[in-house]
Curated annotation (Swiss-Prot):
NCBIfam families documented for this protein: HAD-SF-IA-v1, HAD-SF-IA-v3, PGP_bact, PRK13222.1-2
Pathway: Organic acid metabolism; glycolate biosynthesis; glycolate from 2-phosphoglycolate: step 1/1
Functional description taken from the UniProt entry: Specifically catalyzes the dephosphorylation of 2-phosphoglycolate. Is involved in the dissimilation of the intracellular 2-phosphoglycolate formed during the DNA repair of 3'-phosphoglycolate ends, a major class of DNA lesions induced by oxidative stress.
Family matches, as CDD domains: HAD_PGPase
Residues noted as binding Mg(2+) in the record, renumbered to the chain: D11, D13, D177
Necessary cofactors: Mg(2+)
Protein name, per record: Phosphoglycolate phosphatase
Enzyme Commission designation: 3.1.3.18
Active site residues of this protein: D11 (nucleophile)
Matches recorded under Pfam families: HAD_2
Organism of provenance: Haemophilus influenzae (strain 86-028NP)
Root EC class: hydrolase
Upper taxonomic lineage: Bacteria, Pseudomonadati, Pseudomonadota, Gammaproteobacteria, Pasteurellales
UniProt xrefs under InterPro entries: HAD-like_hydrolase_sf, HAD-like_sf, HAD-SF_hydro_IA, HAD_2, HAD_sf, PGP-like_dom2, PGPase_prok
Source domain of life: Bacteria
Length: 224
């Protein structure tokens, strides 16, 4: 066990789980109800990372450019609600854990690290997704988009973990795939690993200057 770090926090989408196919399906199902075009999966990928409301706002902005159709504030809220409905029904139809995630998490847990999830994903979806892959029991805390007043890239979730478990920021390592993860960790004073395989708006994670850059989740064991 690395004696510097006591707690390891993880992003969810694009870090632990490849959820893009189910997210894209749910976005397009919601758009279709309002006679809006279907977005390519590779485009939906660039919209992920700031929570459901921002995801839908980006989708509607794209749809507006395609069709010229502008939705009312009420309709925008309805699209978001329909997205949440469809995603709730399709959390893990085709989503998959990334390679070596479960085994690596189990090893870290056995080594004595406190594990936590910090995601901007709607809070009500977090535990069900983790449970679907049989890894929810490995985490001592699971924070979603509605768990706290602020979400990443704000450092509040990491400060919360420090306070709850009694650790200093230097004792926390965060692992994510997006610039939001790197910014939040740096702002909180935590070390951070950037993963290259996730959803960072098609921007290389190296540009956000994480402390380590890994291509494979199992590489965490080289520093822990």
């Amino acid at each position: 066990m690395n004696t510097q770090f006591k707690l390891i926090g993880f992003d969810l989408d694009g870090t632990l789980v490849n959820s893009l196919p189910d997210l894209a399906l749910s976005v397009n199902s919601a758009l279709a109800e309002f006679n809006l075009p279907k977005a390519p999966e590779e485009l939906v990928l660039t919209w992920i990372g700031n929570g459901a409301p921002v995801l839908i706002a980006r989708a509607l902005d794209w749809a507006k450019k395609q069709t010229g159709k502008v939705l009312t504030e009420t309709e925008v809220k309805q699209v978001t609600e329909r997205f949440n409905f469809y995603y709730g029904e399709n959390l893990c139809n085709v989503s998959r854990l990334y390679p070596n995630v479960k085994e690596t998490l189990e090893t870290l847990k056995e080594k004595g690290y406190v594990l936590a999830v910090v995601t901007n994903k709607p809070t009500r979806h977090v535990q069900p997704v983790l449970a679907a892959f049989g890894i929810d029991h490995l985490f001592s805390e699971m924070l979603g988009g509605q768990s706290l007043p602020a979400i990443k890239p704000h450092p509040a979730p990491l400060y919360y973990l420090c306070g709850k478990f009694g650790f200093e920021p230097r004792q926390v390592l965060f692992v994510g795939d997006s610039k939001n993860d790197i910014i939040a960790a740096h702002a909180a004073g935590c070390a951070v690993v950037g993963l290259t395989y996730g959803y960072n708006y098609n921007i290389p994670i190296t540009e956000s200057n994480p402390d380590w850059v890994f291509d494979d989740f199992a590489q965490l064991l080289t520093i822990l």
